Regions:
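C-terminal catalytic/motor cores of large multi-domain enzyme assemblies
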Residues: 1-244
């Protein structure tokens, strides 16, 4: 029987090593070296749910809400490229590639697989890529997964009983979007009638050494616009002409 200095009974002692040590070091560095600010917003996702249902019914394609929000993030970042950046020493680096680091807990560890050029992929491509990525991570095939090179991060806790979150940025990325669970709640419509709506809380944490609150406001405005018209944005690819 072993107790600590305060007399508490110790069940087990493990060394801080491997992936757990790497995560601890990265998050400690993030907290102490980057002045962070977080904004939160509650957005209506009824249209997203309808789009997901129609995609399954009409094309037989099942995508997760996480997939949809990753694509939405790519579109929102495309409209707010000041967030697609990194602060490294005395330099502010702005990227043209939009590579999304998607936080995921795999086999008990926090991983950050990267969806490269997410702005140039539609929802079907992103969903298929993430499914394959998660499968490789669960099987321990790390060499087949891109785990670095992200320019913007996404943390999805939508499947957990979490109403809101305040994610830490994951350097060198200068911003991270957090997604919490969907809740069906009563809201007022344009005629002041109480109606049910699916609402989801989104957060955006930024490096204040890189950008300011204005970018957070603009990002949420873009995100809301995208979520209200998923039929347009889920198949949007940067650099390609939109269909009439």
């Amino acid at each position: 029987v072993e107790r600590d200095e305060a007399g508490r009974l110790i069940r087990e002692i493990k060394p801080l090593e491997g992936i757990r040590k790497t995560i601890a070091e990265r998050m400690t560095f993030s907290k102490h070296e980057y002045p962070q600010g977080t904004g939160q917003v509650l957005l209506n996702v009824d249209k997203v749910m309808q789009f997901r249902k129609e995609l399954l019914e009409k094309k037989g394609i099942k995508v997760s809400f996480g997939d949809l929000y990753v694509k939405a993030a790519a579109c929102a970042v495309e409209e707010n490229m000041a967030l697609n950046a990194s602060r490294q020493k005395e330099k502010l680096i702005y990227y043209d590639d939009i590579n999304l680091s998607v936080m995921a807990t795999i086999n008990g560890f926090l991983m950050e697989p990267v969806v490269e050029h997410a702005d140039q992929k539609d929802i079907e491509e992103i969903s298929a890529e993430l499914k394959k990525t998660y499968e490789n991570l669960r099987k321990g095939k790390l060499m087949k997964v891109k785990l670095e090179g992200g320019t913007f991060a996404v943390s999805n806790l939508g499947s957990a009983l979490i109403d809101s979150q305040q994610p830490f940025i994951s350097p060198p990325e200068g911003a991270i979007m957090g997604i919490s669970r969907n809740r069906r709640v009563p809201v007022f419509d344009e005629n002041d009638n109480v109606v049910p709506a699916n609402m989801t809380s989104f957060a955006l944490t930024i490096d204040h050494g890189l950008c300011d609150g204005t970018e957070v406001v603009n990002f949420f405005a873009s995100l809301n616009k995208i979520l209200q018209d998923p039929w347009k944005y889920m198949y949007h690819k940067r650099g390609q002409a939109e269909e009439a």
